[in-house]
Swiss-Prot record:
Gene of this entry: rplU
Family: Belongs to the bacterial ribosomal protein bL21 family.
Protein name as it appears in the record: Large ribosomal subunit protein bL21
Stored PANTHER family: 50S RIBOSOMAL PROTEIN L21, LARGE RIBOSOMAL SUBUNIT PROTEIN BL21M
Cysteine-cysteine disulfides: none
One Pfam family recorded for the sequence: Ribosomal_L21p
Transmembrane segments: none
Signal peptide residues on this chain, from the entry's feature table: none
UniProt entry keywords in alphabetical sequence: Ribonucleoprotein, Ribosomal protein, RNA-binding, rRNA-binding
Classification of source organism: Bacteria, Pseudomonadati, Pseudomonadota, Gammaproteobacteria, Moraxellales
GO cellular component: cytoplasm; ribonucleoprotein complex; ribosome
Length: 103
């Protein structure tokens, strides 16, 4: 059984006991959250597709940790003008462990 959920403007396919990195959520470490933006649920040959979400479906997940991703480098450069600008960015994330998929 798996589900497709929406979190942070992105869609994620999730299974039970799977770890998932999503955009930063306002939840404490160890807290259990309920995600109700379930777009699709598949159980063997049986599937439910929401329009836009599946009614009554939810995914329960536990917050494992909050952290920051790897640094990316943003570089701007203009040739022949001695202009060179570099900037770094690290995106915050929340690591979730999927506990249950409820239909």
């Amino acid at each position: 059984m798996y589900a497709v959920i929406k979190s942070g403007g992105k869609q994620h396919r999730v299974n039970v006991d799977e770890l998932l990195k999503v955009e930063l959520l306002k939840a404490e470490k160890g807290e259990t959250i309920k995600i109700e933006d379930v777009l699709m649920v598949v159980d063997g040959d049986d599937y439910k597709i929401g329009q836009p979400v599946v009614e009554g479906a939810s995914v329960e997940a536990e917050v494992v940790e909050h952290g920051r991703g790897k640094k990316i480098r943003i570089v701007k450069h203009k040739r022949r003008k001695h202009y060179h600008k570099e900037q770094g960015h690290r995106q915050w994330y929340t690591l979730l462990k999927i506990k249950a998929i409820n239909v």
